[in-house]
Amino acid sequence: MSRRRVFLIVAVVVFAGWLSWLGYLAAYKTNPVVVSRSQMMASTHFVLAEVKIDSETGKPARDVRVIEDLRPVGVALSGTIKVENIKLGRVGGAKDFREPGLYLLPLTAVGKDVYNLTVQPRSPGQEAINYDSVRPWAYVWDAPGVKEQFESLVPKR
């Protein structure tokens, strides 16, 4: 067997191995949950909340029950709060809100016991955003990596 043929066979085996590795990653390691740094930096409150589903619409109900205020500023949030734009929210770590489950909700206060899921702020150089069309993120607390990312993005106060 000539030297060129050996190099060709080795190259084909390495290429096939590389394609197999990429196929494995595509099949089993897809859709990781990435917690948005800009959304966390723009938020004023971070709560673990239980979200109920409205039986009529199938969408999340605006009233959510706070389980824990993760980084309280002043008095910690507790009880039931209203999240006005939760129906627009997307969920990292799941296809949609589901019961039962704990969700990390990055919030911005808009009134007494009334909050919005924080939308991602405008990036430098980006044209004006129509905030009515932007869908904010909530995160499944038990999804792989969410707790660790949150801890690294939002230090304890």
What are these regions (language model features)?
Residues 41-46, 50-52, 77-87, 91, ...:
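Structured catalytic/translocation cores of nucleotide/phosphate-coupled proteins
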Residues 54, 67-69, 73, 86-88, ...:
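Generic structural motif
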Residues 59-83:
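OB-fold (S1/OB) nucleic-acid-binding surfaces
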Residues 42-68:
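Structural detector for short beta-strands of small beta-barrel domains
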Residues 51, 64, 81-83, 103-107:
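Hydrophobic beta-strand residues in large extracellular and virion-surface proteins
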Residues 2-29, 86-157:
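Netrin-like (NTR/C345C) domain of secreted extracellular proteins
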Residues 24-44:
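Short boundary/loop segments of OB/S1/cold-shock single-stranded nucleic-acid-binding domains
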